[in-house]
């Protein structure tokens, strides 16, 4: 089944409810049962996979057998698969630096429209950043509270982009599941109109934390009049790299009025993902980077997920 941007998505379900985190506890999922079981000492690698065709339409009718997962070139045994989307814990980062003054109302409206697309069991936080980073609203499922937080943005100051992403990733780490009903996919959506100018945290530190997280990062960088300027090239590199490494997507709208459509595309993507998980065939607990490749048996479609993960270390 093919879904284009803006369509209502009601993916079929293979009922397996447990996703992501709890790596320190470990999860074993029985493909024949309704609920996963927990087993200490087992580490599950969880993947949120987006599949598109050549026209970038989302493909939502694939089966478990259509997916092949490789870690460092070795085929892995998929132990859970689901087309049903678990709830989301979402961090919404909004650039409120001085250069955003004339565009801020459009950004606020687009961000508000986006949070209204969240489901009742999703939670989100709102962070705005200029020369400082402020958590306007902690994680909540209350849309009125999210609306209020977005409406409070005021433009001023420089751009602490790296600081904001770093803090948001740290906040997402605090969203811990007590049981399988509490488990959430994690996503971070960051909008900025320029390069970082005032962060204390380096891009390398941000990238390392992102690669160690379970978070898909979606980046939106507004193109200025001079896309060849050094500042924009640096911002584009940061935004594109974070998205590619974490299985998210980078957007570079030419006009601020394109923002609403961009946020709609992100909402559609989050509603179209598959969740796969496996226990690595590599038993070493060496903390090394392990590269992941997902392939599909169906021709002319492309999967996208995070590039890899760091192996656990000895407890």
Regions found by a protein language model. Name each.
Residues 32-315:
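Scaffold/interface architecture of coatomer-like assemblies
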């Amino acid at each position: 089944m093919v879904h284009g941007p803006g369509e209502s998505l009601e993916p079929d379900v293979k009922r397996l409810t447990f996703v992501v985190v709890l790596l320190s506890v470990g999860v074993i999922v029985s493909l024949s049962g309704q609920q996963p079981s927990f087993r200490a000492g087992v580490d599950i690698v969880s993947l949120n996979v987006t599949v598109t065709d050549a026209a970038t339409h989302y493909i939502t009718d694939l089966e478990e057998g259509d997916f092949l997962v490789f870690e460092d070139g070795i085929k892995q045994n998929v132990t859970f698969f689901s087309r049903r989307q678990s709830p989301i814990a979402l961090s919404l980062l909004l650039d409120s630096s001085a250069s955003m003054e004339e565009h801020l109302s459009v950004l606020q409206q687009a961000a508000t429209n986006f949070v209204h697309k969240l489901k009742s069991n999703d939670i989100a936080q709102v962070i705005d950043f200029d020369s400082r980073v402020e958590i306007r609203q902690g994680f909540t499922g209350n849309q009125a509270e999210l609306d209020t937080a977005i409406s409070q943005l005021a433009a001023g100051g420089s751009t602490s982009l790296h600081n904001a992403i770093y803090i948001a990733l740290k906040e997402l780490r605090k969203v811990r599941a007590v049981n399988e009903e509490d488990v959430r996919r994690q996503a971070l959506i960051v909008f900025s109109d320029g390069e970082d100018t005032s962060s204390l945290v380096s891009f390398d530190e941000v990238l390392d934390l992102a690669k160690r997280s379970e978070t898909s990062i979606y980046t939106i960088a507004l193109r200025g009049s001079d896309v060849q300027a050094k500042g924009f090239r640096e911002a584009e590199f940061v935004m594109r790299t974070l998205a590619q490494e974490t299985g998210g997507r980078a957007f570079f709208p030419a006009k601020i009025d394109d923002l609403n459509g961009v946020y709609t595309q992100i909402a559609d993507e989050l509603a179209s993902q598959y969740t796969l998980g496996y226990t690595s065939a590599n038993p070493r607990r060496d903390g090394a980077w392990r590269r992941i490749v997902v392939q599909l048996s169906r021709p002319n479609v492309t999967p996208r997920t995070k590039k890899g993960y760091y192996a656990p270390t000895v407890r």
